[in-house]
Design a protein with these regions (language model features):
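Polytopic transmembrane helical bundles with strong interfacial aromatic enrichment
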Residues: 1-145
Length: 145
């Protein structure tokens, strides 16, 4: 297989999709199984420092892992669609269903989790600077996971 061909392009797309998906879902496991229990048992000053410095970095990789997985997934689907070919069997429909579910997951990251986490991070920065706490930040943190 020549890497500078149509099949080579699909090869790279699949690998970028695979690696970015591992990044995205791996960080999701980190948030759920490592960070959340850690925050539950830490002292407030430690938690505040982690929210200000660690969480934004982890969320950056989480968000962009989701974005790259989303983009490469739809590029793979668009490259595989051909007149009368992709949706003839169950394979194409199964991949399309996966793409729709992945799109919903991506939208949750970008339009639910990230805006709520921005509020939580900004609240931690404001409180550390001596400003008043945002009462909506606690609820946003619960909603965003």
């Amino acid at each position: 297989m020549a890497l500078l061909s149509y099949e080579g392009w699909l090869f790279f797309l699949r690998w970028f999709h695979f690696l970015s998906g591992i990044t995205w879902i791996g960080l999701l496991y980190y948030f759920n199984f490592v960070q959340t229990p850690f925050f539950a048992e830490t002292d407030p000053p430690v938690r505040s420092g982690a929210v200000q410095k660690l969480v934004p970095r982890a969320l950056w990789w989480f968000r962009w892992g989701a974005m790259l997985t989303f983009i490469t997934g739809w590029l793979i689907i668009l490259h595989r669609i051909s007149p009368g070919g992709f949706f003839v069997g169950t394979y194409g429909w199964a991949i399309l269903l996966g793409g729709i579910i992945g799109t919903l997951m991506w939208a949750n990251v970008w339009f639910v989790i990230w805006p709520k986490q921005k509020m939580v991070i900004q609240n931690a920065i404001d409180v550390a600077a001596g400003k008043a706490a945002n009462p909506a930040a606690a609820a946003a943190g619960q909603r965003a996971g």
